[in-house]
Structures are given as C-alpha cells and as structure tokens.
C-alpha cells in the first residue's frame, strides 16, 4: 500500500521537503508484534480494459518456522503489457515484491525484503503548436518544417540546428515577426482537426526504468521499555528517457542508508509521553546527464509521424552533447529527536528537531557536454543545517480537534537523478522549506462522520534543470476541506474542496521567468506558422505580475459515492470539477474548467 502523507515529515525520517511524501508499505505476513497470519493465503488476478489493457498479478503469504523460530513471508508479482489511448504509446512493466519477518527471540526480531521494478514506456509531452482555437475547437495548424538534415543521416544534429539560428530571444510585447528568419517558417500550411490521442510521442521514444530496493530492519525490546530499531536501506535505479523532438536524459544512481532509532515512552495518570532519537548516515552516488539544448517542440506536424524534419540526434544516442553531465556523490550525517506528549485533558504536543551535515562532490567530465570543453570541471563543498517542527492540538469533549503546526526543514535540492550539478556548488544544493498550518478536524456519529479543514502557507525551493544557476522558490497558500460519512454498511459518501495559489517568488524578485513563447504570446503576429520551425524564447512573466504558477487550478471540488451490494459487487461514482487554468506561465492560453 501507499500512504500519502501531508505536511512535514518526521525528523526521524531524514531531511525532506515540506510539501509531504509517499510512504510505501510492503505486504507482510506479520499482523502485530509476535503475531503472524494464521494460515497460508494467496490470490491471482487478471485485469483487462480498453486499449488492450492486460495486467496479471499473483501473491502468496503465510506463516512458518525456521529452526523452531516463528517466520512469515509475503511475495507479490505483477506483469503488465498494455497499449494506450495515445498513439505510439504502450506500457510494459514487471514488479516483484517480497517481505520476510522472523522472531529470533521474544525480544529480537528481523524484517527484510525488497522490490524489483522494470518499466518500459514513453513520456508524453502532449500537443504542440498550441493556440486557444486548438484548445477550444481542436483546430490545429498543419505544415512542414523546412529540412535541416544536411548530412542525410535521418536526424538533426546540434550543428545543423545552430547553422540556421532557430532559437531566438525576443520581447513578446513588441515582436512583429521581423526577428525570425525564413528558415523558421512552415511550408504547406493549413489546418486540420486534431484528435486528443495525437501527441508528440514518436514511435522510437523511450522511457525505461529499472529499480532495485532492499531493506533490513532489526528490532530489539529491552526490559526497561526501550525499543531499539536498526534500519538498513538500499536502492538503485537506472533511467533512460528519449524524445525525438529534442530531449533526452539518463540517470544511474544508488543510495545506502543506515539509521538507528531509540524509542521509549512514559505513562502516568494524566500524561502519555513518547520519545525517539536517531542518528543516521546516508550515502548517495550518481551519474546523470540531461540533454535539452535545441529542444524544438513545434517542428513536428502531429497529423503525421515524426520524421527527419523534426527528429534531433540525441546525446544519449550520440554519446556526447549533453546540456549538463554530473558524476559525484554526497554523504549526509544526521541526528534527530522528537517527542509526542498527550495529556488526559485532550492536549497534544509534538516537537521535533534534526541536524544534518552534507559533504558533496561533483564532476563534469571533459568532452561530455555541448559547450563544456575537454577538461574535467570539479567542485566540492560542505553544508549543514537544522530542521524543526512543532504541532499543538486539543481534543474537545464534543469531538472537535483544533490544531496548529509550524515547521522548517533543511534538505538537499537535487536533480531528477539525485544529481547535484557542478554549477550549483557551492550555494545551490542545500536549502530550507517552511510551513505554517492551522485547522480543525473531528469525528462524530460514533466515528462514522469525519471532517478536516486546514489552512496553510508553505515556502519551498525546487531545482530548475534549464536554469541550473538559479533554483526557483515558491510560496504556496491554500485551504483544504474533506468530509467522509459512512452512512451505513453499504453506503459511503465523501466530498473534498481545495483552494490553492502557488507564487514563484524567484520571478517576483526578478520580474523575469525564462520560457518558450507560443502562438498566443504575440499580440502583433497573426500567423504563428512563421516561427513554428524554431523556438522564440524570452521573458514569460510579461503578463503575470502576480507570478502565479501555471497548470494548478485555484479551486477544485469533488464528490464520491460508493455502494456495496453485499453480494460481492460494489459500485462507485465520482464527480470532480476544477477551475479553468493557464496552460503556461504567461497565461496566454487558458485550459477550460
């Protein structure tokens, strides 16, 4: 199962961003301390559906004994081979999970297991040549980009792109088309109705991932009430992402962590106090390359397949020409402590603190990047920081629980491949996130009716791979409301509402946000086909003075009803409505509600 956890992570977990996290729980034969499944169990399933969906799963688990010791096991496997609604898209994946539990003594037990996941599919960049008419009516501007593949190898190299100067910085408020060369114009221009399944996916696009995970936990219970847990964790992954329009990347990384958690509790007539403290060490090793220079989205005509008119020679295939290439590692040493205090009166106080130190080194190998030269570029640095969180709540006699939470967390700001770019050392790879939240929640009608209301503000930093010198800091303000009602043993109703606004503080400070400019960004250009063969770029903040992040609806509403017929069948229906929202940072194109 997967837990979606909102808010700050416990300091015991390690350095993390404020916005929440996913917690993966492997299936286990253990149902409590010293307790296992009563008998072996298992299941098989086959799922089919539209677009040739095929998923087969099998699982088996149960109790046993090894050398007279209680033992439990659970193994799960899944294989999928499915097509997709989108053209040129399919999914092939294999998942194997295994979990084992064993009581060595009445005080010492072990839990270990792992997961292997292999995925083959593709990335979907959606539509290109986007206009408001395309969004509203499906009307697409057709036409061919002019040929650039002068050596006839079937792909456009960086040098063939550079020869025509198709990446042009302009001011969208004043540009009238005079800055664009003739080579940027489409030929055989027309219009067509575009299907929603026709996207930028090319037949030879690749998104491949292979992940291996292993964990080994030892739990010891002392005579004086302490729980001592040693947790070992290892994960490695390889990723390859190739897109014909001009983006590719690879990641090869692994992480090893060992953490010891000491926990105890004290109970009196009026107070239950729980305490934990934990030292940890975490080592990350990475090799990663991104290839996004000469990324031309609009050259391909989506009414046909990708051809030599739009297909770029990718760095992952050529073996060089990356925009950035990083090889390195970092070591994170941490110490954390937290307490959870609950008084009989209903008052609860949770406090946590953490200290982290990070040593990082990164190298860009000579000859690997497009403009980096033949010499290695090396950087190293050390950083440290504190994290803390505090939450206070009060459970009233009528079931209402008002609460306030505040937190600040220091974390490593890494790329998608756990990589740290040489250009971000020092100063750009370690930062803090902040959160302040308050709200009220409660249960009524014998806990059959639950609701929660929260109002929050958070600030966090994200890495921007295409602007590696400056990481973007965002401020999020929002309100969330949820209610769930178990009406009876057959009917469950739920409703949700969210209000959120995400502001790019980096853009507010600079009044600048780099981006690609599209058809609706130019008030003085009536025919965007004159530049669809290239990429105009510049400041997309020209009409977004409040620096609101695109693609996030301000208001979202949802209703769900589930009915169990008590004969092995159940039905559910959901209705979701979201506000209209800008598709890009400039707000030139609006996606409907």
Where in this protein do the model-derived segments appear?
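Outer-membrane beta-barrel translocator/receptor signature
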Residues: 11-97, 104-109, 212, 449
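Structural signature of Gram-negative outer-membrane beta-barrels, strongest in the C-terminal barrel
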Residues: 272-291, 297, 324-460, 476, ...
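Residues on the lipid-exposed face of transmembrane beta-strands in outer-membrane beta-barrel proteins
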Residues: 58-62, 98-102, 214-220, 258-264, ...
């Amino acid at each position: 199962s997967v837990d979606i956890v909102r808010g700050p992570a416990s300091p015991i977990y390690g350095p993390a961003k404020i916005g929440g996290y996913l917690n993966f729980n492997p299936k286990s034969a253990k149902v409590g301390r010293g307790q296992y499944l009563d008998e072996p169990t298992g299941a098989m399933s086959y799922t089919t559906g539209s677009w040739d969906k095929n998923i087969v799963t099998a699982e088996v688990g149960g109790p046993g004994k090894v050398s007279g010791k209680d033992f439990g096991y659970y193994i799960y496997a899944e294989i999928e081979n499915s097509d997709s609604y989108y053209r040129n898209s399919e999914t092939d994946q294999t998942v194997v999970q295994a979990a084992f539990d064993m009581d060595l003594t009445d005080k010492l037990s072990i839990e270990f297991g792992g997961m292997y996941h292999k995925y083959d599919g593709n990335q979907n960049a959606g539509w290109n040549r986007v206009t408001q008419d395309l969004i509203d009516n499906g009307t697409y501007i057709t036409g061919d980009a002019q040929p650039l593949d002068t050596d006839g190898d079937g792909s456009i190299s960086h040098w063939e792109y550079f020869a025509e100067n198709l990446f042009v910085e302009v001011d969208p408020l004043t540009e009238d088309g005079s800055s664009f060369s003739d080579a940027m114009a489409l030929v055989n221009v027309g219009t067509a109705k575009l299907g929603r399944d026709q996207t930028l996916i090319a037949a030879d696009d690749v998104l491949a991932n292979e992940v291996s995970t292993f964990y080994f936990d030892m739990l010891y219970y002392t005579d004086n009430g302490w729980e001592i847990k040693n947790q070992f964790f290892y994960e490695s992954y390889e990723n390859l992402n190739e897109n014909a329009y001009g983006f590719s990347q690879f990641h090869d990384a692994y992480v090893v962590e060992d953490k010891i958690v000491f926990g105890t509790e004290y109970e009196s007539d009026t107070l239950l106090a729980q305490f934990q403290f934990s030292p940890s060490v975490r080592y990350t090793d990475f090799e990663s390359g991104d290839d996004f220079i000469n990324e031309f989205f609009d050259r391909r005509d989506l009414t046909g397949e990708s051809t030599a008119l739009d297909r770029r020679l990718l760095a992952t295939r050529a073996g060089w020409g990356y925009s950035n290439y990083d090889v390195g590692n970092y070591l994170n040493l941490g110490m954390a402590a937290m307490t959870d205090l609950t008084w009989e009166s209903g008052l609860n106080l949770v406090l946590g603190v953490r200290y982290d130190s990070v040593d990082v080194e990164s190298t860009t190998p000579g000859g690997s990047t497009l403009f980096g030269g033949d010499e290695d570029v090396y950087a190293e640095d050390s950083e440290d920081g504190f994290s803390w969180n505090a939450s206070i709540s009060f459970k009233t006699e009528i079931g209402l629980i008002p609460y306030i939470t505040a937190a600040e967390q220091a974390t490593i700001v890494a790329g998608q491949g756990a990589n740290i770019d040489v250009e971000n050392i020092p100063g750009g790879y370690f930062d803090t996130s902040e959160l302040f939240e308050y709200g009220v929640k409660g249960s009524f009608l014998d806990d059959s009716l639950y609701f929660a209301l929260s109002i929050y503000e958070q600030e966090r930093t994200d890495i921007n791979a295409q602007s590696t010198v400056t990481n973007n800091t965002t401020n999020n303000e929002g309100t969330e409301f949820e209610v769930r009602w178990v009406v009876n043993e057959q009917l469950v109703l739920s409703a949700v509402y969210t209000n959120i606004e995400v502001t790019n503080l980096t853009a507010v400070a600079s009044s600048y946000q780099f981006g690609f400019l599209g058809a609706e960004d130019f008030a003085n250009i009536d025919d965007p086909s004159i530049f669809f063969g290239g990429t105009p770029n510049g400041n997309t903040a020209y009409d977004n003075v409040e620096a609101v992040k695109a693609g996030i609806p301000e208001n979202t509403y949802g209703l769900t009803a589930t009915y169990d017929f008590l004969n092995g069948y159940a039905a559910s229906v959901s209705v979701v409505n979201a506000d209209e929202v800008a598709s890009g940072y400039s707000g030139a194109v609006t996606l409907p509600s």
